[in-house]
Amino acid sequence: FSRWEHLGPVNDVKLFRMNPDCTNMQAIAGQFGKSFNSIVQAQEVPGEPGTFVTVATSRRGTIQAGAVMHVDARSQTSTNPDLYIDVQQARFTNLTPDVPTGMGSPPSGVGRYRTPRSIGDGLLLVSWADGDVNERNELADTAPNFGIYLFDPETQRRTLVYDNPDMWDVYAIPVRPRDEPPVITPTVDANPDPSEPAIIGSIDITATSLRENVNGAQFDGVPLGEALAQATRMRIIEGFSSEIGSVGQFGLTMHEGAAILGETPIYEDGSWRAAVPAYLPYHLQPIDRYSIRNQMLWIQAMPGETRTCGGCHESRSDTVEPRMGATTIAQQVGPDMSTHIAIPDRVELPWYGAPSRENVQDVLTRNCAGCHDGGAMDPYAGRFYTVEVTTMEGEMLTFEIPYLDLSDRLIEAYYEDEVVNYPASYVSLMYPSAMMGDSMALGDVPPEWVVPGEARASRVIEVMNMTAEGDAGDLAWADRPLHPEDQGVDVSREDRMILIQAADLGGQYYSRWNVEGGYDWSAAADY
């Protein structure tokens, strides 16, 4: 099945598989190596497990139509028959190379495809429509016409099978004998108790196949595996949508709503286990003694299901073994139950306007706005940059954004095709990273004070610095002092952690607790 993956800058559709009881959800293809945005309408090639024909599309305004793509997700290195799929080794072959797959979906004169299905001898049954098959059809008030065709990828020839011009002809299935699929025995109760927790964890978080380097704070080009060895806790974050209330976006960020269920310990062998509410989407942040890091993939589990990965993006073709014996320390200790908590007990970080919660603005007002409020004592007083925006209607708008103002006075900005009002602190810190392609910044443009999802790369976190847990003399950026302590103002480690968490969660303005007219979650017993 195809799954929409939206987490901050990640916004695409990937190919997944799972058991009929919705357990053991795994990525098959699309996380690595694809040159297009989205994989949709995939069908496994009969007799070739791990290979698929699918549609590659740019996602936006294409009616899920695009090029026909062959996906080979079989591992090229594994000798274990149970590990024959490897998302990291998936290969993509465009069977209709003339069909563009870029985000712009330009005119090509070759039409677009939907719902391919292999019928043997290299032939495919497809739906095809002439033209661009995108939003330009709406502008021209001309709907695309999909008919059913037999397609030969080798010759690029289409043979018409059926076309009713009054409707779309899609999802054609050949009527023919097929092998009865095997029965997969359920691993969870057919009628599970939704309050029963799922268990998630890792064998060894240092096991990774990603060849990435980590920078920021104590790291300067350190390989990811070495950086993960310094992780002390796993932060577990629930994601939720704007259905919580009357908001289209969660602020000047592409990140979703976020709530921290807890930070469970990572043991000396790299293992961890935690109980979490079932069904919900989570992403994980392995954090070090300074409380900083991130991971960009949603995971889910059923009630009573145990999901244990090998590491952090470990090789899907290898078996990860415990470092210190037959079982991990986390297995011996048992799952951390403190993370199986109801909605009111989860940590959310509304920026402003949540009367029953600590707001990010409360931290800034308490520690920072006394100097950075645009007044006479502010070293950045009078500094600003100008943002020019051309709206979809062609109107030119101009906004003055303060270089750094951490007060709660409301100012205007432009984001996602609308004029928005937020506290100056939020716009100052978030706008340098939030400006879209329809904006042009002129003048005294500041650094990216907050990089959503990356506290380690956020300038404001670097300037303030952070102390290690249990050692106030151990600084994340060892070559610079704590700020504003160097100016005679003391900030608690707890307040610093709120700012770090706000950045690492994605820099959201809204949470469940500050949406006007939203539900009162204070008495909610839901998981």
Please report, for each region that a protein language model flagged, where it lies by residue:
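Residue position within the beta-strands of beta-propeller blades
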Residues: F1-R3, T51-A56, L124-W128, P181-V183
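Short, acidic Ser/Thr/Gly-rich low-complexity loop/linker segments typical of extracellular
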Residues: L252-D269
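Signature of short aromatic-glycine-proline-rich micro-motifs recurring in repeat-based ectodomains
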Residues: F36-R59, T101-D121, P177-D179
